[in-house]
Amino acid sequence: MGKTSDRLDEQHLAEEQVKDAVRPPSMYKVILINDDYTPMEFVIDVLQKFFSYDVERATQLMLRVHYQGKAVCGIYTAEVAETKAVHVNRYARENEHPLLCTLEKA
């Protein structure tokens, strides 16, 4: 009886470890924040260049940033979201714009 109980305990422990190991990664929203200085055309360029939106969808998102103060550009794993935000912020600074890209847990 002890061996069966031990095997069941080991099997249960292994199942719990597998459940923990295959937990989906945390996801993060990549958000553009409005400012009074960055040209609308530059925001559209950013949305096309870094998020692969066509000009129509990029324009819609740019208008959301402009009128609502911010817009979610996409939802990604932490590493991808952070990389996109860093690239957008660097590109904005290189072009002397104060555009800000942030992350928020989804």
Swiss-Prot record:
<dbReference type="InterPro" id="IPR022935">
    <property type="entry name" value="ClpS"/>
</dbReference>
<dbReference type="GO" id="GO:0030163">
    <property type="term" value="P:protein catabolic process"/>
</dbReference>
<dbReference type="GO" id="GO:0006508">
    <property type="term" value="P:proteolysis"/>
</dbReference>
<comment type="similarity">
    <text>Belongs to the ClpS family.</text>
</comment>
<dbReference type="InterPro" id="IPR014719">
    <property type="entry name" value="Ribosomal_bL12_C/ClpS-like"/>
</dbReference>
<dbReference type="Pfam" id="PF02617">
    <property type="entry name" value="ClpS"/>
</dbReference>
<dbReference type="InterPro" id="IPR003769">
    <property type="entry name" value="ClpS_core"/>
</dbReference>
<comment type="function">
    <text>Involved in the modulation of the specificity of the ClpAP-mediated ATP-dependent protein degradation.</text>
</comment>
<protein>
    <recommendedName>
        <fullName>ATP-dependent Clp protease adapter protein ClpS</fullName>
    </recommendedName>
</protein>
<comment type="subunit">
    <text>Binds to the N-terminal domain of the chaperone ClpA.</text>
</comment>
